[in-house]
Structures are given as structure tokens and as C-alpha cells.
Regions:
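Gly/Ser-rich oxyanion-binding loop with an adjacent helix/lid
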Residues: 1-94
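C-terminal nucleotide
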Residues: 74-182
Length: 182
């Protein structure tokens, strides 16, 4: 097939331009050759594979899932092969808010090594506790042993773990607030 694509998403801006393109191609192929049988989650997973292998970017699945599923969603990646996706209905306009996307002027196109370091460092923290991924580490145990973890894995790995725990808590709180109209 031939396709001409035009986008206003700035490449390398952190707005998931590659994920949006991967999902677009996945949806086209799904419609042309699979009769729409491929799920949004599978299209996202295929897009992640393309991101990792073709583009050489060590991305997770979040950007592709957001592009593929669409709308405001909560995604639990505890099982990356079977993520739990929950649509979050919230009418920003009805509440007097507007959700905006801005161009920060920052380009992250050359940060591949930094992105690749994230899962490595988070897995190092998990390994300290005998786990494979940070999701399986008890947060209270992490904080009880943070000094030892820091000696073994380094400052940046500890900061990433703290960020991981804080973000997971924040997201759950925000989803609850949106559902409650708060």
C-alpha cells in the first residue's frame, strides 16, 4: 500500500511522535489485512517492538498504549504482556478546565542512552531485593534499606526508584480524583 502521512506532532519533542506513527501504520495494516481483528493493545505492543527494534529506542509501552487506546486512560503494566487498560471519563470543559499540550522547546531525540539506563537501574534496585522488576518490590522495604541500596546501585538508581513509587501513587490518586469529579 501507499500512504501519505502529515502530522503536526513535533518529532523528538516528547509527544510520542514515533508511537503515533507506529500505531497509525498498525491500524492501517489491521484494517487492510486483518479485518480489524488486532486489538488496540496488540497494536501498541507491535508498535513498541518497532520502536525497540527498527528505531533502536529502548522505550516502554506507555506511549504506544496511549496512542492506540486513545483518550484518557489508566494503564497498569504489572504484567506487560497483558496490561490492564481502564478508560477514565472526565469532562475537562464541563469542569472549566482545558487540557493543553505545549512545545517545551526541548529535544529528547539524542537521549537514547539515558532512556536505556532507566530500566537497567530500576532492575538493579529490584535485584537488590531478589526481584526482577521494581513493581514487585515492597516500597516500605525499599525505604528501610535505602542506604544499602544506594551503596550497591548508586544515587541515580535510588532516585529513579523513589520516582517510580511516587509516580505510581500519584497516578492512582489522580485517577481517583478524576472519577470523583474532584
Amino acid at each position: 500500500f501507499e500512504a501519505k502521512v502529515r502530522s503536526t506532532v513535533l518529532p523528538g519533542s516528547g509527544l510520542s511522535s514515533s508511537a503515533a506513527f507506529e500505531v497509525l501504520i498498525g491500524r492501517i495494516l489491521n484494517g487492510l489485512f486483518a479485518g480489524g481483528a488486532v486489538s488496540a493493545i496488540e497494536i501498541a505492543q507491535i508498535g513498541q517492538y518497532a520502536e525497540n527494534v527498527y528505531y533502536g529506542k529502548p522505550s516502554g509501552l506507555m506511549d504506544q498504549m496511549a496512542s492506540s487506546v486513545g483518550g484518557l486512560v489508566y494503564i497498569d503494566f504489572a504484567d506487560p504482556k497483558n496490561p490492564i487498560v481502564e478508560k477514565v471519563d472526565y469532562d475537562f470543559a464541563h469542569s472549566g478546565y482545558t487540557l493543553c499540550t505545549i512545545d517545551s522547546g526541548a529535544d529528547h531525540a539524542d537521549l537514547t542512552d539515558e532512556y536505556a539506563a532507566m530500566p537497567v537501574e530500576m532492575k538493579a534496585v529490584a535485584a537488590f531485593f531478589g526481584k526482577e522488576v521494581l513493581h514487585d518490590v515492597d516500597e516500605a522495604a525499599f525505604y528501610r534499606h535505602v542506604a544499602e541500596v544506594r551503596k550497591v546501585t548508586g544515587d541515580r538508581a535510588v532516585l529513579r526508584a523513589i520516582h517510580f513509587f511516587n509516580e505510581n501513587r500519584r497516578v492512582k490518586s489522580q485517577v481517583r480524583a478524576l472519577k470523583d469529579g474532584d
